């Protein structure tokens, strides 16, 4: 759990054997199979909130709801969107009663937001919302657990912040290759191996045709 802010942060990613989350053209559906995707819905059901960056919304248009889980509850849906670029027709705005939070920066574009009773806009005091600020705001709203689902830049931001407690990595039996294909984690500023993030692997299990690595950050 994030020591200062009281929120347990879990980072979940689905990647190929060579660590890619999309091809060079941006195609990403599906890297993993149905069993792994069902596990993702179980994870969402166990967390108070789920978070993605704006690039993931624009590329994949996710719903971020819980489906296929008996008596499941969809978490609060959060988008990091520094410049308020999220399209108004994004599926995340579907009014199903699940709260939506958009975290923007202080230089965000002036715009009209969808008229939804469960929509909340948080404006950061900085151009790009800092992870510690985001977690502090979520804690004020009573949220105690957060599932981070992408993308590459957002994963890196959370890992660099030191707030991530748990990693849940679904590995699909595919190889994309190439330098242009998107790697699952963005720049961490690691120049020497002794600067690399160290993890403790709790378990490696088969999930359908895929593998699930459950680990903690040291």
Q: Can you say where each PLM-predicted feature lies in the sequence?
A:
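Enzymes that bind and transform nitrogen-containing heteroaromatic metabolites
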Residues: 1-218
